Amino acid sequence: MIDFRPFYRQIATSNLSAWLETLPLQLKNWEKNTHGEYAKWAKIVDFLPELTADHLDLKNAVKSDRTLPLSEGERQRIIHHLQQLMPWRKGPYHLYGIHVDCEWRSDFKWQRVLPHLAPLQDRTVLDVGCGSGYHMWRMVGEGAKTVVGIDPTELFLCQFEAVRKLLNNDRRANLIPLGIEEMQPLGVFDTVFSMGVLYHRKSPLDHLTQLKNQLRKGGELVLETLVIDGDENTVLVPADRYAKMKNVYFIPSVACLINWLGKSGFTNIRCVDEAVTTLEEQRKTDWLNNESLIDFLDPQDHSKTIEGYPAPKRAVIIANK
């Protein structure tokens, strides 16, 4: 099973130490209620070797390599274990010559977001809904002191820990399997990311307040979410599914989203990027045993979802507490 004690020791002398009042008990309770597959996935992580990279690049990619290449047997064993953790959603990873080609080219999103961020050097960062942690490693590559990701999905935790073992067992990033609503308000993070989460929330304004409660005064929020065209009063509420997703509740216009942020007490609110999701950014690969974007769009008109709504478009909003 995943051992969280190194993280507890790490934060005990940091500005995250107050979290120790609640987190250990929460994770004990979490372990008692894990999905039946979790034990199998955690064992796969145990089977993976801890490798030390001679060359580690988290600045331009998530890439590890060493001077002495893996033997073909070592390489095939690692591929086998990683494939048992499919589907791999967010990536890509380049690990000792093994290309984990995930469904999402998350490096595309990072390239859109990065130019607009306050420098992450020496920052304490929270990534809400972090998935398997691709962007967390890129944050480390930008010099962040501590990156904490939260995501309740057990498979993502095991994927993250698998990658960590192949990245020098790097402890600058840690994934905690909780949702933002379960976190005590810490109010200490320099930067909080919420990317691809807001539209899954039944109460988006509550989510914005939860994000604000984790930021220090003056800290930076990076919010990336689905949007639609329209004025400050425009919000799409799908009747049933959106792009085959049943858990999509509110898709606002950029102007409406800016209003929500202002109403939630954020300042210096600005939209820094809008981009329609392309078939190059989200697609089927050998590491995804499932449908992808092409299956969610109208086959006759890719400007619409299969349900007839506007196709996915995402905006990046940056604001301060």
From Swiss-Prot:
Gene3D superfamilies: Vaccinia Virus protein VP39 (3.40.50.150). The keyword DNA-binding does not apply. Its EC number is 2.5.1.-. It is an enzyme of class 2 (transferase). InterPro entries: CmoB, Mo5U34_MeTrfas-like, SAM-dependent_MTases_sf. GO terms for molecular function: methyltransferase activity; transferase activity, transferring alkyl or aryl (other than methyl) groups. Keywords: Transferase, tRNA processing. Pfam families: Methyltransf_9 (PF08003). GO terms for biological process: tRNA wobble uridine modification. It catalyses: carboxy-S-adenosyl-L-methionine + 5-hydroxyuridine(34) in tRNA = 5-carboxymethoxyuridine(34) in tRNA + S-adenosyl-L-homocysteine + H(+). Carboxy-S-adenosyl-L-methionine binds at residues 90, 104, 109, 129, 151-153, 180-181, 195, 199, 314. HAMAP family: tRNA_carboxymethyltr_CmoB (MF_01590). Belongs to the class I-like SAM-binding methyltransferase superfamily. CmoB family. Homotetramer. Catalyzes carboxymethyl transfer from carboxy-S-adenosyl-L-methionine (Cx-SAM) to 5-hydroxyuridine (ho5U) to form 5-carboxymethoxyuridine (cmo5U) at position 34 in tRNAs. This is tRNA U34 carboxymethyltransferase. It comes from Actinobacillus succinogenes (strain ATCC 55618 / DSM 22257 / CCUG 43843 / 130Z).
